[in-house]
C-alpha cells in the first residue's frame, strides 16, 4: 500500500486488525514490482492509478481488480474534490453545472469509456 495514502489508513485500520500483513511503500511503482515478483499478493490502491499505472501496461497483463470498490467515509470521505481559491463561487457553480450536464445524458459515458475500463465517477 502507498505510504501516507487513504488506502494505507484503511489497510491499517481494517485489514491489519483482521490479520492481513500491510506493507507500506514509498512509491506505487514499487508495489507493482513486488506484485510482479510474487513478494506481494495484492494491494489496496487508487483505482484510476492502478488502471493507468499498471493494468493498462504490458506488465499488468494477467492482473485485474478484485473485490468491491471501497467507499468507507471514515477513510475516504465523501468522494473526490477539486481545489479552487476561496470566493470562486461562479467557477464552482460552472464546474458543478458542467459535470451535472454531461452526466445527464450519454456524453460522460462516451468520454469515460474512451479512457477507462470502469466508471471513475464511482457510486
Predicted regions and their residues:
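Proline/Glycine/Serine-rich low-complexity intrinsically disordered segments
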Residues: 1-123
Amino acid at each position: 500500500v502507498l505510504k501516507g495514502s487513504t488506502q494505507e489508513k484503511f489497510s491499517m485500520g481494517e485489514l491489519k486488525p483482521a490479520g492481513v500483513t500491510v506493507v507500506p511503500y514509498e512509491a506505487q511503482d514499487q508495489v507493482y514490482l513486488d506484485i510482479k515478483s510474487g513478494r506481494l499478493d495484492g494491494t489496496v490502491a487508487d483505482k484510476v492509478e492502478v488502471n493507468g499505472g499498471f493494468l493498462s501496461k504490458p506488465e499488468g497483463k494477467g492482473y485485474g481488480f478484485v473485490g468491491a470498490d471501497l467507499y468507507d467515509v471514515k477513510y475516504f470521505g465523501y468522494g473526490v474534490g477539486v481545489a479552487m481559491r476561496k470566493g470562486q463561487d461562479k467557477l464552482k457553480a460552472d464546474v458543478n453545472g458542467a459535470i451535472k450536464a454531461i452526466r445527464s445524458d450519454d456524453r460522460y459515458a462516451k468520454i469515460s469509456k474512451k479512457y477507462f475500463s470502469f466508471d471513475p465517477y464511482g457510486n
